[in-house]
Amino acid sequence: PWTKVIPAIGLSPRDCALIEPMSVGFHAVSRAQVTDNDTVMVIGCGMIGLGAVVRAALRGADVIAVDVDDEKLALAARLGATHGINSKTEDVHARLMELTGGSGPDVVIEAVGSPVTYVMAVDEVAFTGRVVCIGYAKNEVAFQTKYFVQKELNICGSRNALPADFRGVINLLKKGNFPTDR
């Protein structure tokens, strides 16, 4: 219904196309309850993952972007990621241990939907960490469930966004702080 419409006056059609996927990333950061004391790893730097990078950075978190594409990692850096890891060419675990002093990230946001990245999220998150899964795995994911218990993890899913997430993205785009040319 019309009551659900959020005006995006002044934005180009290209900008408007970014609102929904970025809002999903914004919402995942809210679900993870990210604060400025957190180190957040975002796996996958597509539009949804980049939305998570932006929102986590805006909340003051240290953001580690992980992807297989150096161009996407460079864009993530422009949007607030403090570190980037190319999982195709680097040892993700070793680099995370280096960046986090051996503890792993406090929060992992999985935005790919691959069984490999689901397992990576659980394996790499810190003790008492938080994992938010956005991506849909098309195949079964096999976990060592002892890690859930031993690491005392909080794991949740996130699939959409709230009106506040949409408004946040629209305001960000109106300020011109997001490079929509990429």
Task: Describe the residue ranges of each PLM region.
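C-terminal substrate-binding/catalytic core of Rossmann-like NAD(P)-dependent dehydrogenases/reductases
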Residues: 93-98, 138-182
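A glycine-rich helix->loop->beta "capping" turn
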Residues: 99-107
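N-terminal Rossmann-like NAD(P) cofactor-binding module of classical short-chain dehydrogenase/reductase
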Residues: 109, 132
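Glycine-centered, small-residue-biased loops immediately flanking beta-strands
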Residues: 38, 129-130
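Local beta-strand N-terminus motif with an aromatic residue
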Residues: 81, 104-105, 180
